[in-house]
A protein has these predicted regions:
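Exposed, low-structure sequence patches enriched in small/polar residues
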Residues: 264-266, 388, 397-853
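Bacterial Sec-dependent N-terminal signal peptides
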Residues: 1-35, 52, 112-120, 527, ...
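Short, acidic, small-residue-rich periplasmic hinge/interaction motif at the N-terminus
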Residues: 37-39, 51-53, 84-87, 101-148
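Structured extracytoplasmic
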Residues: 121-293, 299-307, 369-474, 566-567, ...
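Short, ordered, surface-exposed loop/turn motifs in non-cytosolic proteins
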Residues: 31-34, 41-56, 75
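Short, acidic Ser/Thr/Gly-rich low-complexity loop/linker segments typical of extracellular
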Residues: 58-68
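Hydrophobic beta-strand segments
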Residues: 50-54, 80, 118, 156, ...
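A short, solvent-exposed loop/turn motif at the edges and junctions
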Residues: 54-56, 79-92
Length: 853
């Protein structure tokens, strides 16, 4: 019995072993290899990412970038299929042989594409084993070879046209009583710009440029040869408007990782990290101007991020160059005043070289409410006459990246007709004549003067203008109600010389103040035309709050009259100043001059070397006589020239400023010293998470001076947010003779709040701020160690109100929301150090009027 069981077990083992061996042999003899290539039947070009599959099975593969495929399988099948979007599917019979080579030529399908957006299924989207992702990775891998910066030298000509039109013009709007005298303007309506929408062109700017670039050392230069613009220079800074449009419509290089567009940084769909932020879908293959391309649709993974959506048309060869782009942005992005954006770029091959940009069109629909009255903007750029790798002289690249060198005939009647690359439409031509006609109508002039008053604070009376109106009334606790009235001459009086003056009276202090100045232009242009070269002489008898330094705001301002904490310290300055301003096209400038100030204390400020709490003055005033030199460099800066201030647009380059002053008894100063200040500021864009403004400043005083001549650190006791001031520091709270400071202001552009349902509909934008100040005061300049110096201010009990920063830095930080009601920013700020000082606020809210896109 046992022997029987033994033979039975052995038989089972032998049978099993034979079965496994035979089965393995059968599998090995059935395995086969199929390989080959897939190419375009018309051009012979390889077709990457084509699908190769065995009919009736799940076995298959995709062709590589050279159109090659390889399949190894033991699954029986008789037919192999070859397919790719836009091509006719082909099939071939296959045998049971061990290796077969099949080369297939696919023919294009004839497909009529409707004007619809294809929305592919998004179920279980993943990057792994995704042909669309593999394709975009090839584009990214090759992009450094396809961008124009790859060439050692590059030269081309460029024609740019920017135009704006009032959109959604209705019959009711046209019949409005306010337009009775302007009805002729509606004869220039255009219905071709936007399908189903009537627009009224109101602005057009054209320019012709020569562009040069070199790879090593990296340099670029654009020389504007001619420019034509609708002229409203009496009311607006035409150059400033042009500069803002260039800032708004910056050149788009799709091969860059990040694209600066409408003041925000967007991640490019061909950025190195793009597959982590975008989804990609291969939609079709089609011919774009006789070039076979793969149409690749892309969209953001998160619709609230600063990303594009649209189509890339990728050339079907080993270059993986981009033939065409059409893209826009998602309506859920936190962009203000914008309803819709469309961007189109076409690339052409010039000679046997690579694919270079030939045409670009950007359309922006500005508006608050969709389908209501808005503003429609269009930028069209055409490129031609490319010269590649023809050596260029180094002289070309000297100076700023963009300069004007107008050809003599640029303003002649026939110049633009023969030189613009694309003819103007009838309505575009009419824009120039319509604006010229409107300027002759008295009613239009009145409305423009009113608009100028609202936007600039000045009202034009012809040869003079009065303002700024926001300074006509203000209040402080020392002077009480303060009334001021002033104005200046306009270019209607003289383009070379400008007079300005104001008079002010304070009720409580019973003081009369005034200012008078004259500025003379040393160039044929006015004192407002860059580059400015001018001399100025000015006399001022007025008060100043110690430590208040305002940006783009007059100190006599109704909105700055509301303050927290005591506001009882003023200097009364009687100053005569002579200065020379010299600006260069490179955006380097210097301001040199001499000033003499007789400074007196006012309110609860006293000049005493004894007990400050006695509130008496040992002397009535000090004499401050200085020679000064200020240097500034802001490479490639563009700006809007306002009536008082110059408003720069943030650029890619840092702004560097050095201020120096020399005071000496030999020039009738009461003290001997040298004062130095260095300031560096720059904006950094951080792709989808916004941008950061950083400012670093340092200062040093060499000499022995009283506290009015020390660095009185910039404080802000108002409720209006000032970026360059310390929001919770009191006036005259801190002084130093040397310091260094860091100011960081970051805007997230809604990156966080856009992820929160409902909240994102408000389109708020998060901001964070951080300000730190390190300072010190030497014993020579500290009244506690030097009895000859004025005592620091105290209250009546002798408690100090002014301090040095020797022990620790001053630190404050805040969080806030901008884009509230589209125009306001509110910050909550907390003070972290020196919180025990008298009369200080350790936290608070501040507001700012701020216009962002």
């Amino acid at each position: 019995m046992k022997l029987h069981k033994f033979y039975y077990s052995v038989s089972i083992c032998i049978f099993t072993a034979l079965f496994v061996c035979l089965n393995s042999f059968a599998q090995n003899t059935g395995k086969r290899v199929i390989k080959g290539s897939v190419v375009d039947a018309n051009t012979g070009d390889p077709i990457p990412f084509a699908t190769v599959s065995l009919k009736g099975t799940t076995v298959g593969a995709n062709t590589d970038d050279k159109g090659r495929f390889f399949i190894e399988t033991s699954i029986p099948a008789d037919i192999i299929l070859f397919s790719f979007i836009g091509y006719q599917t082909e099939s071939r019979n296959i045998s049971r042989g061990t290796e077969q080579i099949i080369n297939i030529r696919l023919r294009l399908s004839i497909i009529e594409l409707d004007e619809v957006r294809v929305k592919p299924r998004r179920v279980n989207y993943k990057n792994k084993d995704n042909p669309a992702v593999e394709l975009i990775k090839k584009v990214i891998e090759k992009k450094d070879f396809n961008r124009q910066e790859v060439y050692n030298y590059l030269e081309f000509k460029k024609y740019e046209k920017i135009q704006f039109a009032i959109s959604n013009i209705t019959e009711k709007f046209k019949q409005g009583s306010q337009f009775i005298k302007f009805r002729f303007a509606f004869d220039n309506l255009d219905t071709t710009k936007r399908i189903g929408n009537t627009v009224l062109p109101v602005f057009i700017k054209e320019s012709l440029s020569d562009y040069y670039s070199q790879k090593d050392p990296k340099a670029a230069k654009e020389i504007i040869r001619a420019e034509k613009i609708t002229n409203l220079n009496e009311y607006f800074d035409n150059k400033g408007v042009s500069g803002y449009l260039n800032y708004l419509y910056q050149d788009i290089n799709i091969y860059d990782n990040e694209i600066l567009f409408i003041t925000n940084k967007f991640l490019s769909p061909v950025a190195k990290s793009a597959p982590n932020f975008y989804r990609y879908y291969i939609l079709d293959t089609l011919s774009v101007n006789n070039i076979n391309c793969i149409k690749l649709f892309f969209e953001p993974r998160n619709k609230q991020d600063f990303l594009f959506h649209g189509n890339l048309y990728i050339i079907m060869d080993s270059s993986y160059a981009i033939r065409k782009i059409d893209m826009g942005i998602n309506k859920n992005i936190n962009l203000d005043w914008i309803q819709e954006i469309s961007i189109t770029q076409d690339f052409d091959q010039f000679g046997q070289q690579g694919w270079l940009l030939s045409k670009e069109e950007i359309l922006i629909d500005f508006g608050i409410i969709k389908n209501s009255l808005g503003l429609y903007g269009q930028r069209t750029v055409s490129y031609k006459d490319y010269k590649i790798n023809e050596p260029l002289s180094a002289v070309i690249f000297k100076g700023p990246e963009k300069i004007e060198r107008f050809v003599p005939s640029a303003n002649s009647a026939g110049f633009w007709e023969s030189n613009r690359y694309v003819p103007l439409t009838k309505s575009e031509k009419g824009t120039y004549t319509t604006i010229d006609s409107l300027k002759k109508i008295p009613e239009f002039k009145k409305k423009m003067k009113l608009l100028t008053l609202i936007t600039t604070g000045f009202y034009d009376l012809g040869n003079i203008e009065i303002g700024p109106v926001e300074s006509f009334y203000s209040y402080n606790s020392v002077e009480g109600s303060r009334f001021r009235f002033g104005g200046r001459t306009t270019t209607g009086y003289s383009k070379k010389i400008t007079f300005d003056a104001y008079a002010a009276y304070a009720l409580k202090a019973d003081l009369f103040k005034y200012n008078a100045g004259v500025t003379y232009s040393l160039t044929p242009g006015t004192i407002y035309q860059f580059p400015v070269k001018s001399i100025r002489l000015n006399y001022q008898n007025d008060t100043r709050i110690p430590g208040q330094e305002l940006l783009f705001t007059q100190p006599d301002n109704l909105f700055l009259s509301f303050k927290r904490g005591p506001d009882d310290k003023l200097f009364l300055n009687k100053t005569i100043k002579a200065e020379l301003l010299n600006e260069f096209e490179s955006h380097f400038s210097y301001l040199a001059g001499y000033s003499f100030t007789r400074q007196s204390p006012l309110g609860n400020i006293h000049f005493t070397t004894n007990d400050y709490s006695s509130y008496t003055n040992d002397i009535s005033h000090i004499n401050i006589s200085e020679l000064f030199l200020n240097l500034r460099y802001a490479a490639n800066e563009s700006f809007y020239q306002g009536k008082i201030y110059r408003f720069p647009f943030p650029g890619k380059d840092p702004v560097i400023q050095l201020k120096t002053a020399f005071g000496s008894k030999s020039i009738y100063n009461d003290y001997d010293y040298i004062r130095l200040q260095l300031n560096l500021s720059r904006r950094y864009y951080v792709s989808v998470i916004g941008y950061t403004d950083i400012m670093v400043e340092a200062g040093k005083i060499i000499g022995e001076v009283p506290y009015p001549l020390l660095f009185i650190h910039t404080a802000n006791q108002t409720y209006y947010y000032q970026k360059n001031s310390y929001s919770l520091m009191n006036f005259l709270e801190f002084v130093s003779d040397q310091y260094i400071s860091l100011n960081i202001d970051h805007s997230f552009n809604g990156f966080i709040l856009n992820k929160i349902p409902l909240v994102r509909k408000l389109k708020f934008r998060e901001v964070v701020t951080f300000k730190v100040l390190y300072g010190s005061l030497s014993k020579n300049n500290n009244p506690d160690y030097n009895a000859e110096l004025f005592k620091f201010p105290t209250d009546e009990s002798g408690i100090p109100l002014t301090y040095s920063l020797d022990k620790k830095p001053y630190v404050e930080a805040g969080v806030g929301l901008s884009n509230i009601l589209r125009i306001f920013r509110v910050d909550f700020v907390k003070r972290f150090t020196y919180t025990g000082h008298p009369n200080v606020s350790n936290h608070g809210f501040l507001i700012q009027f701020r216009f962002d896109i």
